[in-house]
């Protein structure tokens, strides 16, 4: 019986490790064309908050390397956290020489303006792919006076320091978890939570990268399982202790890049 117990323990450990494994590395995508404008002021203070729910982009680690995406790219919020490489293209009058690249994270939504034509003011109208860059990032690729420039862009792996962060907000019967600092594909499409006394439960996306559960999780240590848009998953076991409090942030395992 002792031997059987040892075998079962080993098998359980192997299964747990296999569930937590992160196979492969996100490779990004091919080059496409779009246009870019800017917003938020010279210090990017006007970019704080936003439709992804990240709040203070400085304290969350995104800084000024951010952009608001048009409807065609935003994907109803599922693109939040995705990373892009951009270059100013085909406009020698306004593009900086050498076509330097910038790398940004999607943190906001650029709403359409149907009162303006899509080629004159309604830059974020569907089906146009468009980036409204934080002003400091726009100035890295083009002159301020340009206002709007054509760009080439592609999805790239997100390179982040540290682990995935889970910030738990809400109250006893409403848990709202903000997920930030995701490496690899960057944007997540599924989030699961497991308490000490529960099975795995799928959380529903509330808005941006805020995910909700109406289960009572207070008093239990919590594990989270993140699935990114490239279908890789990362499981962070028992990262929130049983005495966790609303408003706290916990760090889990990130994706390899």
UniProtKB/Swiss-Prot annotation:
User: Topology in the membrane?
Assistant: Peripheral membrane protein
Q: Where is the Expansin-like CBD domain?
A: 173-252
SMART domains annotated for this entry? DPBB_1
Q: Which residues form the Expansin-like EG45 domain?
A: 49-163
**GO BP terms in the entry:** plant-type cell wall loosening; syncytium formation
Q: Where in the cell is it found?
A: Secreted, Cell wall; Membrane
Q: What is its main location?
A: secreted
Which residue spans adopt a coiled-coil conformation according to this UniProt entry?
Answer: none
Bridged cysteine pairs (disulfide)? 52-80, 83-158, 88-95
Keywords, A to Z? Cell wall, Cell wall biogenesis/degradation, Disulfide bond, Membrane, Secreted, Signal
Write out the function statement from the record. Causes loosening and extension of plant cell walls by disrupting non-covalent bonding between cellulose microfibrils and matrix glucans. No enzymatic activity has been found.
Q: Which family does it belong to?
A: Belongs to the expansin family. Expansin A subfamily.
The record's annotation in PANTHER family points to: EXPANSIN-A15
Protein known as? Expansin-A6
Protein's organism: Arabidopsis thaliana (Mouse-ear cress)
